[in-house]
Amino acid sequence: MNLSALPALRLVAALIAVAASGAAFGQAKCGLNTGKAAAGEPIMIGAVVGKTGPDDFSASAQAAAAYFKCVNANGGINGRPVEYIVADDQWNPETAAQVASKLVKDRKVVVLAGNTSFVECGANAKMYADEGVMVIAGTGVPRECFFAKNYVPINSGPRISATIAAMYAAKTYQSKRMVCIIPNIPSLGNWGCEGAKAWGKANGVEVETIAIDPGSADATSTMLQAAAKKPDTIIMHMPKGLLVPMMAAAEQQGMGKKIHFVSSAPAYNADVPKAIGPYWNKNFAVNLEFNPLSAAGPDNKNWQAVLDQFGAKSDPRDTFSQAGYVAARLVTETLLKMDPKKIDRASVSDALRKVSDFRSDILCKPFYVGSGNRHNANNSGPMAIVDGNGFANVPGGCVTADDPELVDVRADELKLGLK
């Protein structure tokens, strides 16, 4: 990998990062809930993550590992324990291809779950399809993660998140002219803003994109460039490291008094409200890819309990973790419906493609896999607004993205009888 790309990759890693913690709620519930350890023949499940390199991007797999430990302590998959093998791609496409090949061709995993990587989608999607193995990924970021037949991200992705933020601004502020600011990173860049732009074109809202160099962007110049376009709303589509100085520059120019500011999911970070300061109190709305980390739903509470009882104290309790938990639960519940003696890659892939109504209160809508050529089942999310040193949910709950790029996804949903 080109080392000169590492600073940008660090920023990409933060692009969807959030930080929050949760307390344990009761006893963790997993799988059969028998309280007896599984002792049969192991079922091999893998994951590819970017653990070492620019940043540690492995929280989804850590949560999945905790869930599978809980499953193994509660009867396993009808008596068979899960052997969960996590491989580090080191943020290197060549390494990603090598470690995935070992998992699929040497270790003979029947499925991968909890993947979180910025490089493996492009490196491995064809191999996964050729080998007939499914990936129920925790978090997808680059475009390639959402355009592969055998790769199924649990999260909604950056394009959907920005589109929902734009829809919120148009409805709440009656905005007719917006600017979307995003780092010019390959496979993310303009694509991350194009959903908002396409939705705007169909709904009488003009959306322009400003793509910035994440390594050399000047906050004041960028905000003045955005203001010069005379927008009603500015969509911030960047990691915290870029966001905070940009918001400070906007405050210095008094832009928050005449322009509305919204953001995609990266701003849903526990540190952001305090970092940007009181000027933005109740004046900065952000999209969430899942329901809030502090939500009181039983599955969200169980995610926290699983991490507390079967994970490490150092395991993040963030949205990456939520995604990994959901991925592991979906795979587990699919396997539990199968004859444990007949579990192999082909039968597992077939069973996963038949998933059409998986429910979790962490998600806004039932999740599905299906047989489509690509996957973006999670395309809804709520909005929150900065409130003091935290966030408050805004009325309206989950919003479904009206992105024209989802036309094929909507067709797949109709085939499955989903609305």
Question: Where would I find each of the regions flagged by the language model?
Answer:
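Beta-alpha junction/loop-to-helix N-cap segments that form part of ligand/metal-binding clefts
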Residues: A28-T34, D56-Q62, N74-C145, I154, ...
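Hydrophobic alpha-helical segments within soluble ligand-binding/sensing domains
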Residues: G31, A96, I154-M178, N190, ...
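Extracytoplasmic "Venus flytrap"
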Residues: G31-A65, A87-E94, T116-S117, I181-W191, ...
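Periplasmic-binding protein-like
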Residues: L103-T116, I136-G138, M178-I182, K230-K240, ...
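Extracellular/periplasmic bilobed ligand-binding domains
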Residues: Y128-E131, G192-N291
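An alpha-beta-alpha
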Residues: Y151-P214, T233, G311, Q322
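Extracellular/periplasmic periplasmic-binding protein-like sensory domains
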Residues: A250-Y325, G397-V399, D412-L418
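Segments of small-molecule ligand-sensing domains
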Residues: Q309-S321, T332-P395
